[in-house]
Amino acid sequence: MTMKPFNLDIIGQRPHLNIYTQLSFCYSLADNPNADATRQSAADTLAQGLKALARHIPWIAGQIIHEPSTEPRNSGVYKITSWRDAPPLLVRDLRVGENPSAPTMQELRKRNFPMELLDERLIAPYVTIPGATAGANRDEPTAVFAVQLNLIEGGILVTFVGQHQVMDLVGQLQVMKMLDRVCRGEEIPEAEVALANREREGVIPDLLGDEEEEEQLREHSEKQTVKIPPAAADTDAAQHDKEKVKPVVSPAVWASFSFSGQSLAALKAAALETATSKNISTDDTLTAFIFQSITRARSSRLIQNQNPSPTTSCTLGRAVDARRYLNIPATYPGLLNNMVYHSHSLQETVSMPLGVLASELRREVDPTTSRIGLYTRALAARLRQAPNKGSISPAATFNPSRDIMISSWAGTGGDCYGMDFGMGLGVPVAVRRPVFVPIEGLGYLLPKHPNGEIGLVICLREEDMEVLKGDEEWRKWTG
């Protein structure tokens, strides 16, 4: 299917977002007397559904291309062009005997589906950071969206990946919900199709440009400005940005934790005792608890190394969906997330009452007090004016040794655990993020399970992780 080139959202023009977001849905085949037929039917259903989705939304089957600029220190333009008649679907048989390194459904269940058993190199069609994993094919076209169906003993793992310059997790989930509809023979509402295919220019409103806005924006803008060394000023912008976000491979490690519904309710109740806002959410409380706990685990190392001193700030970067702050429908399948920052001294971070910190987090996302809409309009305005889009990044001032960045997918659980894609497998028993190269200080709260459980995957250097796992307060609340 041929289509004219499709533009990306302006905030998707940043080169460092040339990565993939992965979600793996784990389906059980236990007690299925027709398992072989079900496996084949599942693959056929997904293949037909992807073709149907592309007929409604042609760009979903496209590829992202980069048009370099001839001007120095200019990152060029990224856009979507025609590629296939449907997004790629890979089917891999990973059952015992075919690939001994693949987990079985029994093993996954026994260990509560840990990230460490779900290797992106095995179960995902594209790795998170292209070229960062040994063996990754750099010459492969950059797909907008792709799916891999993995056959394992006792189940099926379906991994969906979305290219992050095109869509954030909320946008990717909307694409998956539309795929779920067509796989089940349902129609996608016309309004959702029109919204998906709308021109991206102008989605984010312009700034008003008054003095009050400028003052509010100054600190947030500084957090997202990459400081390019003078020696690098004449290098290619995209190459410099790629080097800037190169992951820390060692000695950082990933680990999985879980918080039961009962534990989360008790943690929130404890936070409410010291909260300055009675509107704090479970997500606010859990994110604040994670920030405090990790900072506490790092504190002895940081103080011993005098980096930082007790008065130097530690920062929590919290990814936020900006749609509702800009009056953009939640069903918009593009890229509209931003980040808010919370900085305190090392001593303040570990000693502050949990409820006070959770209340601070609430103020930044409460629509009545939040400035996320303003921050996002300012981000778009800066990017429109900046020749080198790589000079603006949410992680520009991120120090992985003492800061953390958290993306919460917990609120997507209701949607994720309700999607069966017409495969005849029922709903997933678990939804996870596959493991990828270590990036110290990065974490995700996973989609909330129907039983109330929320999982956490976090990457820390080994010595900090061991301290965290042994921390009495941490162990009290985690599974």
Report the location of each language-model feature.
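Non-catalytic N-terminal regions of enzymes
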Residues: 1-212, 269, 280-302, 405-479
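Adenylate-forming
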Residues: 24-29, 146-150, 255, 260, ...
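Hydrophobic, mid-to-C-terminal alpha-helical segments
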Residues: 276-347
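Helical lid/core segments from catalytic subdomains that handle acyl or acyl-like groups
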Residues: 335-417
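Short amphipathic alpha-helices and their capping loops
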Residues: 2-6, 66-90, 193-269, 314-320, ...
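Short, contiguous, pocket-lining structural segments
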Residues: 171, 248-251, 255-263, 277-285, ...
